[in-house]
């Protein structure tokens, strides 16, 4: 069959569009947080999650049961429900598939779109507003699908009063029954039955009549979604899932094709692409022998002879499956998302081959689809021949199209409806789920059941229930859930501003950290233990977009946001060549031994000997790491000290004057390419070794200006990147710095410090008006967020007269990092609530060494806010490790250019992290990676459940179990008018804000007022509570607490000692109580009047 060029072009376009819907997750080593629904960001958040839910079968929001638990615990308050109903109640989303006929429907007339909030739903019943508010507070477990038939078929559910009915309402139902069945009630009184039995029978009769009234007038159930694949029709009509045959073969093919050197044997013809390798492997070497694969080898040999392209193969398969052209796009999309983890990884290798761990495979999504559809054609043909007959055709299953199409014929000649009993068919006459929900609500709410016997009011009641369906309720509950936390944070910012409007003391030293919310606690503890410090937050690559190659790296890696491609290469070069040679020789010997052992595993002749010898040799170290991980880690480090030490090294940051691209090793091991040549781990070349002096001056000046570091500098300025170290953790990169594309940002901090210390760079900065004197030295550092350690780079270069200041500063940082570990431990169930700080620090070090630890740290879990503004306004505010903190000084940004730059960088990065955790938490199976326990690394590209499943994308359950799924609240210190203008003028930001992917608030730079962006404009937030706990130190507040904590004021950050706290009037508990006491030390300070604040430090 000839295929028109326009069909091939259409298929190309369809595959390109479908590829955007696949998970954009990179291989494990380059894991970078992203919005799983990035392709739908042009839609409003609510519509996007609903669309994805329908397309992928995933959850859009938390379940009603989860929200009911939040209501019961006080996480959502009744006033939150009332507030969201007032503002969002009539815009809570469409009602999917359950519309009653327009006409005689009670309170709604023909053509009306919304019920009047103050109108009664039925005479004598609740108003529409009362109905919705009451319904939000009720969790009714409505049986669904076949479960509804099973639960209601025996009638037991229909004759018992629902458990949600209060005693008062139960008595009212009894009175209604007596009125309605007065004659029968008088006759039953003459019987010998007990009074309780008579009342029970009366209520049962009333409920039976109520059920009949509602069931009789219930609308038809919503039609099922139209089948998009022949597989869906075969499964529905015969109970046979053809994917169970196709997917295992496709998984093995993809695993072998994308393998990054783990497999002992390389896939034949891999260099020609997946489709060519598949044809040669199964067409010439032999296809599987199962009956469902009959004819596969012949078909593939024919494709080889005719040299079909992937596009032509796809077109042939769609025609062979008899898919109408108008359904091609839906069918292709459904096929790809059926195994979207592997399809997405193939697409990533096609789009970003530079992120392949070792060797990019020539992957194409079109090849993948051609293989998948070819397998589906063969399996479908053989399955239909077995189930229907040898002449069966795919079109015999019925059309792939809109609802209402003719149904396919089952092999037995019957339909599913014929298998139902007469009673079940009667139950299925209307929407059974809707009728049951209306039935329960009529019992619970203040409704006269006799009124519902009238057809008009029965329909009105059913319509009210349908209008306020689960989708609307869950959306409003989600808004109430977000509102409670948002109100707490905005209230706390206003209260903190009123209580502590003063400036901070001159600094002994300064420290710049990543904006990461895990650094919030470290900064807070540092400020508490050493109030003379000033801390700043910035994007973790610190403006240094580079490809980096350390001494231990085989090739360079990009350390910058994934949206950027570095043009400069920074390498680490040993100071002493002799030390380098000895070090590399020892590493090479160790690597050769490991390679020999690994290679032996894949060779049958050596497998038995390896298992006997290597197994015994590895038993003791394995047991030691499992039983005493920290001691085992120390032992490994002690043995490592017997090998040549890592040589002293420096970064090569300055480019040569001729700006020649680095096209070879050049003595540094760099593998940079010519223009257009792919550099694995980096992108397309060329890469130039180092930065020019002017470029370095621009990097330093831009960062210092952005974070508001102006005025005199302290003797030491730390720039501290971060990363995470753990063992047996496939998702380790997910715990590293998102701003460096899943890498560790310590090298960026080190490079920035080297630039800021460079004499020629300082001279260039002086020409720009920024003076950095000889009494200031920048020190790069690295914070390990898992074992809570700090390391510093190039400290031997610190001038002698500044070493005392460096020692004092590092001592303060050591204290802070120990307290940070102590705070982290409150979340770990394996740690007692009264653990000491030193013990806590040892515990987190042990977690990083434990091969059996599924929760080495919680990463970005619990992230919820991003505050862009001066640290002096949030200093001393306990934010529970939940807030990204970005330093910004609005007084030094008259035109808003700096704020625009920050919003365009920090908001997308924060939103990507936040939404990754959001979706992985609400649907750990559909969006998340599920539990870590069955994970198996495959080919260094991803993890599967066991030996053969789809690639699991997103975050593992153990990483998100304590996370509260909310959209990120971005709070910028700026006038509402300026912030609104920035949003309007920048489409990427406008899409995030107006689409509802993030929440945006403005914080007045000159007062405590905050404003929330809603419906295209800012509205002033009205605080509900300005009295928050006041504590001496953070540990007095969180000690003994496992759950999330609201904000609190911490006095130690302002240099106030516990003794001073005890002397304050209004002290309820001694502030000097031990950290193990779960007290709040609720010291109430007098509130200051709202109004302009004193001049602030520009920090």
From Swiss-Prot:
It comes from the Bacteria. Keywords: Cell membrane, Membrane, Metal-binding, Transport, Zinc. Residues 176-194 have a biased composition (Basic residues). GO terms for cellular component: plasma membrane. Residues 175-194, 1071-1099 are annotated as: Disordered. It is found in: Cell membrane. Its cofactor is Zn(2+). GO terms for molecular function: zinc ion binding. Zn(2+) binds at residues 514, 516, 722, 737. InterPro entries: DabA. It is a peripheral membrane protein. Pfam families: DabA (PF10070). Forms a complex with DabB. Part of an energy-coupled inorganic carbon pump. Belongs to the inorganic carbon transporter (TC 9.A.2) DabA family. This is Probable inorganic carbon transporter subunit DabA. It comes from Parafrankia sp. (strain EAN1pec).
């Amino acid at each position: 069959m000839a295929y028109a060029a326009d069909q091939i072009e259409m298929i190309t376009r369809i595959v390109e569009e479908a590829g955007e819907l696949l998970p954009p997750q990179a291989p494990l080593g380059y894991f970078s947080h992203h919005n799983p629904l990035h392709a739908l960001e042009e839609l409003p958040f609510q519509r996007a999650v609903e669309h994805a839910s329908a397309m992928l079968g995933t959850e859009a929001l938390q379940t009603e049961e989860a929200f009911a638990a939040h209501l019961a615990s006080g996480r959502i308050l009744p006033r939150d429900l009332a507030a969201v109903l007032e503002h969002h109640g009539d815009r809570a989303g469409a009602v999917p598939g359950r519309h009653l006929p327009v006409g005689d429907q009670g309170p709604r007339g023909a053509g009306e779109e919304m019920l009047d909030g103050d109108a009664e739903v039925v005479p004598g019943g609740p108003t529409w507003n009362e109905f919705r508010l009451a319904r939000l507070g009720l969790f009714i477990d409505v049986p669904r699908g076949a479960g509804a038939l099973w639960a209601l078929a025996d009638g037991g559910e229909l004759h018992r009063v629902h458990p949600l009915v209060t005693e008062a309402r139960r008595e009212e139902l009894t009175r209604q029954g007596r009125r309605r069945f007065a004659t029968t009630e008088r006759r039953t009184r003459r019987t010998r039955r007990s009074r309780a039995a008579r009342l029970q029978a009366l209520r049962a009769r009333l409920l039976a009549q109520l059920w009949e009234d509602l069931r009789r007038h219930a609308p038809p159930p919503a039609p099922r979604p139209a089948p998009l694949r022949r597989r869906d029709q075969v499964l529905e009509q015969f109970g046979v899932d053809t994917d169970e045959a196709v997917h295992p073969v496709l998984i093995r093919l993809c695993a072998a094709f994308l393998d990054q050197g783990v497999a002992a044997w390389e896939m034949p013809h891999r260099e020609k692409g997946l489709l060519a390798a598949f044809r040669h492997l199964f067409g010439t070497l032999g296809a599987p022998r199962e009956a469902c694969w009959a004819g596969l080898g012949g078909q593939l040999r024919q494709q080889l002879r005719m040299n079909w392209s992937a596009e032509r193969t796809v077109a042939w398969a769609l025609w062979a499956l008899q898919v109408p052209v108008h359904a091609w796009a839906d069918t292709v999309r459904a096929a790809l998302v059926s195994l979207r983890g592997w399809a997405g990884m193939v697409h990533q290798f096609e789009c970003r081959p530079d992120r392949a761990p070792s060797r990019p495979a020539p992957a194409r999504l079109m090849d993948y689809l051609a293989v998948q559809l070819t397998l589906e054609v063969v399996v479908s043909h053989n399955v239909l021949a077995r189930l229907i007959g040898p002449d069966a055709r795919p079109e015999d299953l019925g059309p792939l199209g809109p609802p209402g199409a003719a149904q396919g014929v089952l092999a037995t000649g019957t339909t599913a409806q014929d298998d139902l009993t007469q009673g079940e068919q009667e139950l299925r006459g209307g929407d059974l789920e809707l009728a049951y929900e209306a039935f329960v609500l009529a019992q619970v709410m203040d409704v006269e059941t006799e009124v519902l016997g009238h057809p008009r009011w029965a329909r009105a009641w059913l319509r009210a229930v349908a209008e306020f369906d689960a989708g609307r309720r869950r959306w409003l509950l989600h808004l109430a859930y977000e509102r409670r936390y948002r109100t707490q944070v905005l209230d706390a910012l206003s209260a903190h501003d009123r209580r502590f409007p003063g400036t901070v003391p001159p600094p002994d030293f300064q420290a710049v950290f990543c904006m990461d919310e895990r650094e919030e606690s470290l900064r807070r503890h540092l400020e508490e233990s050493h109030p003379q410090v000033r801390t700043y937050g910035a994007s973790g690559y610190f403006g240094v977009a580079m490809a980096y190659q350390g001494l231990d790296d085989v090739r360079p890696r990009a350390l910058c946001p994934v949206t950027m491609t570095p043009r400069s290469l920074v390498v680490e070069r040993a100071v002493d060549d002799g030390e380098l040679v000895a070090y590399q020789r020892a590493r090479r010997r160790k690597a050769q031994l490991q390679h020999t052992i690994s290679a032996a595993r894949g060779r049958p002749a050596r497998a038995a000997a390896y298992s006997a010898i290597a197994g015994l040799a590895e038993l003791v170290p394995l047991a030691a790491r499992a039983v005493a991980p920290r001691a085992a880690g120390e032992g490994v480090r002690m043995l490592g000290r017997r090998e040549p030490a890592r040589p002293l090294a420096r970064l090569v940051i300055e480019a040569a004057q001729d700006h020649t691209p680095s096209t070879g090793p050049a003595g540094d091991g760099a593998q940079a390419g010519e223009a257009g040549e792919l550099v694995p781990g980096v992108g397309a070349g060329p890469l130039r070794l180092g930065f020019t002096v002017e470029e370095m001056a621009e990097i330093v000046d831009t960062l210092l200006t952005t974070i508001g570091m102006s005025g005199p500098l302290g003797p030491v300025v730390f720039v501290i990147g971060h990363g995470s170290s753990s063992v047996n953790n496939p998702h380790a990169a997910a715990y590293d710095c998102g701003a460096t594309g899943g890498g560790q940002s310590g090298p960026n901090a080190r490079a920035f410090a080297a630039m800021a210390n460079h004499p020629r760079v300082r001279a260039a900065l002086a020409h720009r008006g920024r003076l950095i004197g000889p009494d200031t030295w920048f020190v790069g550092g690295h914070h390990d967020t898992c074992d809570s350690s700090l390391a510093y780079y190039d400290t031997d270069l610190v001038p002698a007269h500044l070493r005392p200041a460096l020692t004092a500063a590092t001592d303060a940082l050591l204290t802070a990092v120990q307290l940070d570990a102590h705070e982290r431990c409150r979340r770990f169930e394996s740690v007692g609530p009264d653990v000491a700080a030193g013990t806590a620090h040892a515990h987190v070090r042990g977690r990083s060494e434990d091969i059996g630890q599924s929760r080495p740290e919680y990463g970005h879990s619990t992230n919820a806010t991003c505050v862009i503004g001066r640290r002096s306004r949030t200093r001393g505010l306990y934010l529970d490790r939940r807030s990204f903190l970005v330093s910004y000084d609005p007084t030094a940004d008259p035109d808003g250019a700096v704020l625009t730059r920050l919003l365009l960088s920090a908001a997308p990065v924060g939103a990507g992290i936040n939404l990754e955790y959001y979706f992985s938490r609400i649907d750990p199976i559909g969006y998340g990676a599920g539990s870590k326990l069955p994970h198996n690394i495959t080919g260094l590209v991803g993890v599967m459940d066991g030996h053969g499943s789809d690639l699991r994308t997103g975050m593992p359950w153990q990483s998100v179990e304590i996370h509260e799924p909310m959209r990120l609240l971005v709070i910028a210190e700026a006038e509402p008018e300026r912030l609104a203008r920035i949003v309007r003028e920048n489409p990427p930001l406008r899409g995030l804000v107006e689409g509802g992917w993030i929440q945006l608030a403005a914080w007045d730079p000159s007062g405590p007022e905050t404003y929330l962006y809603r419906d295209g404009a800012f509205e002033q937030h009205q605080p509900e509570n300005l009295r928050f706990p006041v504590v001496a130190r953070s540990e007095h507040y969180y000690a003994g607490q496992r759950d999330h904590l609201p904000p609190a004021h911490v006095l130690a950050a302002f240099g106030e000692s516990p003794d001073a706290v005890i002397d304050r009037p209004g002290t309820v508990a001694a502030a000097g109580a031990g950290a193990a006491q779960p007290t709040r030390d609720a010291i109430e300070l007098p509130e200051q009047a709202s109004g302009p604040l004193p001049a602030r430090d520009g920090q």
